[in-house]
Design a protein with these regions (language model features):
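Conserved glycine-rich cofactor-binding loop
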Residues: 16-17
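Conserved glycine-rich Rossmann-like NAD(P)H-binding loop of the short-chain dehydrogenase/reductase
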Residues: 32-46
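C-terminal helical subdomain
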Residues: 187, 210-242, 249-251
Length: 255
């Protein structure tokens, strides 16, 4: 059941900050409503809601720890309730963005550290998508966030990079299995971006920022507005035939 006046709706994880925040706002400018998650920073989530309203769209913030799979059933119920409030029972787009960083050598990485990265960056993506599949419209779109580190080898990033590589493979499996429903699935792999991710490592460290710029063909580190429009574009009808792809958005990093 769908009201003909209902806008297209995206679910975006981690939308209170960084790349997902930028994605929510780019979607808002295109007339797409968002249900986005935040883990703990409700004030920042409320700011995103207000900015989306200024852009003439709707954004609704729901709390979710994507590393806690036991919360996914209750979250799916809240999504159903929110969709009903919006006059529909389906959403159109899913952006699996939320994640955590990890920096440690293979020798020193603990089992606890590895489990945490796996829980949030892979297991959470797998099972949250599974829980939401009954609610996504046939012909919808899914974008998973990968990373340049699934291609570029940076010592100290093995668990993070390997699990983003797993996201690349999962994306192709999802695209194959969801093909009969005409749901496209792609991965967007950002390069080094100036956000608060990983403690603002690229944004706030001038030496690292310069190092990234020097190894990037376009001569600078990325910013959120280099990524959000790409994700929003990939969800549009213009890219309806793009499927099962890993699309690196890095300005030509390490080529």
């Amino acid at each position: 059941m769908t009201n003909s006046s209902t806008p297209r709706i995206a679910i975006v994880t981690g939308g209170s900050r960084g790349l997902a925040r930028n994605t929510v706002l780019n979607l808002a400018r295109r007339g797409v409503a968002s249900i986005f998650t935040y883990n703990s920073n409700e004030p920042e989530a409320e700011k995103v809601v207000a900015l989306a309203a200024e852009a003439g769209s709707t954004a609704i913030a729901l709390q979710l720890d994507v590393g806690d799979t036991s919360a996914f059933d209750a979250f799916a119920d809240r999504v159903r309730e929110t969709l009903a409030d919006l006059g529909t029972d389906r959403f159109d787009f899913l952006v699996n963005n939320a994640g955590i960083s990890h920096h440690n050598s293979i020798e020193l990485t603990t089992e606890e550290e590895m489990d945490k990265v796996y829980q949030v960056n892979f297991k959470g993506v797998f099972f949250l998508t599974q829980k939401l599949l009954p609610l996504i419209r046939d012909g919808g779109r899914i974008v998973n966030l990968s990373s340049g580190l699934s291609r570029i080898i940076v010592p100290g990033s093995a668990p993070y990079g390997a699990l983003k590589g797993a996201i690349d493979v999962l994306t192709r499996y999802q695209a194959k299995e969801l093909g009969p429903r005409r749901i496209t699935v792609n991965a967007v792999a950002p390069g080094s971006i100036q956000t608060d991710f990983s403690g603002g490592m690229v944004r706030d460290n001038p030496a690292l920022n310069k190092q990234v710029a020097d190894m990037t063909a376009l001569g600078r580190a990325g910013v959120p507005d280099d990524i959000g429009p790409m994700i929003a574009s990939l969800l549009s009808d213009d890219n309806r035939w793009v499927n099962a792809q890993r699309i690196e958005v890095s300005g030509g990093m390490a080529i």
